[in-house]
Amino acid sequence: MKPLRIWFACVLGVTISTLLGWSNAMFMALFPVFVLVSLNRWNTGLFVQLILGIFWVSVQVSLIIGFLQPYPVLMLIAVGIMLLFKCFAMHHKPIYVFGYVGLLIGSILLNFGSYQAFDLENFIVGIWIATLMTLPICGLAFYCFPDPIEEGPIMSIQGQDKEPKAILEQTALGWLVAMVAFVIFQVANLNDSLSAQASILVILAPMTLVGSLMAAKIRIIGTLAGCMAAMAIQFVLYDMFDNPILYLVSYAIAAGIFCRWLAKDPVWAGIGFSAISALTIPLTTNMVPGQQDAFFAILYRASSILVAVIATSMMIWLGYKLLKSMPWLFSLPRQEKG
């Protein structure tokens, strides 16, 4: 039933946002998918983490940009402190989602908020609506496609409780790469590179060199699969793309394939999530029926993600080597045995 739950929630989110003309339709689809991939049964705590994490980081970013944007040094310090706490939270299972969504959404908001012409408040409200809608959408998915009651775990998330030294090293690695990415997106004119920025943070999530390199491969494979599916939908529908029924049916068919992957092992789940993201974002943000197609947007998305993944992998490797060359930085005082 899990693949059906994920598929139902994903398609329902896109359907609601399409029929009502809401912006940020991609979040309406991806937030429920992100939650349902981690859940085997209903868990209120995970939804609380998601909602609080997004609401809190939105407030943080609004305050940082509103008060500190004219002062780059102070803004850099404030962002560094904020991202450090997000990276640290990701190492603890009870608050992993709170930290991860804070790191991801916070970085996106900081990037877009740096452009004067961008309406940050409207974007934040759209994210809030998508976040709140995740609760009823997932609830309806669990109601329509329940699983038999089992003794298995309620949820499975990536947060890891490790030794203090390992936590410090991996937190430093994640924070270092996140800060470099923040500076790059602040200095360069990359306001149309949402997918590339998200890819940086997605492959950073494991907080380890080996895990991040594996995540990079998964991200590339999933993105190529999703982009090919999005192009196929556009070519098949052609000038009939402005028909909402045909559009939603085509999207549902393509999403169904990737949602089956999401219910498999972690590797397939990673490929599936990257694919569903690559399918959803260009078709919900760049396509304007009768006016603008998404062909070049899909090509740009694939190429920008490829460049971002390669560059991030190099940054993670360099950061790993740099931190390993300074073992004294993470040395903890030894406790004397009584």
What residue ranges belong to the model's regions?
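Hydrophobic transmembrane helix module of multi-pass membrane transport proteins
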Residues: 105-106, 110
